[in-house]
Amino acid sequence: FFGLYLKSAYLLHDYSVFDLIFSKTWKPASGQFGFYPFIVGSIWVTLLAMLFTAPVCLLTAIYVTQYTRKIVLRIMHPAIDILAGIPSVVYGLWGILVIVPFISKYLGPLFGIKTMGYSILAAAFVLSIMIIPFILNILIEIFRSIPMELKEAALSLGATQWQTIKQVILKKAL
């Protein structure tokens, strides 16, 4: 922390924090440091990754906890944990070697865009793949923590399995 402070002290002395955060110009060679594009880019990547990941994880957690046999969950849990243990550098390398060329070769031309593939979309897709194991584990544990009596009560009152999931399980979980 001390080294970081020493290296950035001149920057903090010459510019206000407001100017650093909200300036759109990034030219380090000429002494212009604007963090705004990086902040906005990070927000976009995060929002898109959550948009991609949320439905996949929610539907997978519902399927695994409500429709499949317990053996499927016992097999899937270690696999999900292994995916969660993969270093982010490996995911990033996979993104550069697979996702970026895919976007450049197929998605760009599909939409009439000439691109190298290095984009917010590529970053969001890689981030969404990275966070799937964590969100999926959380949702599975939430659904498993709901008392079985609630599900059985809804089913005994004549609700279908989907009605039970929609009206009881999801409302209790979320």
Residue locations for each model-derived region?
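Individual transmembrane alpha-helix segments
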Residues: 31-49
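Transmembrane-helix boundary motif in ABC transporter permease subunits
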Residues: 49-80
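Membrane-interfacial helix termini and adjacent extracytoplasmic/periplasmic loops
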Residues: 6, 13-33, 92-129
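Transmembrane alpha-helices
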Residues: 78, 82, 135-139, 146, ...
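Hydrophobic alpha-helical membrane-insertion segments
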Residues: 1-7, 81-92
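Glycine/proline-centered hinge or cleavage motifs at structural transition points of membrane proteins
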Residues: 87, 157-158
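Hydrophobic transmembrane alpha-helices
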Residues: 79-86, 99, 125-135
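Transmembrane helix boundary and interhelical loop/hinge segments in multi-pass membrane proteins
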Residues: 56, 68-71, 138-152, 161-163
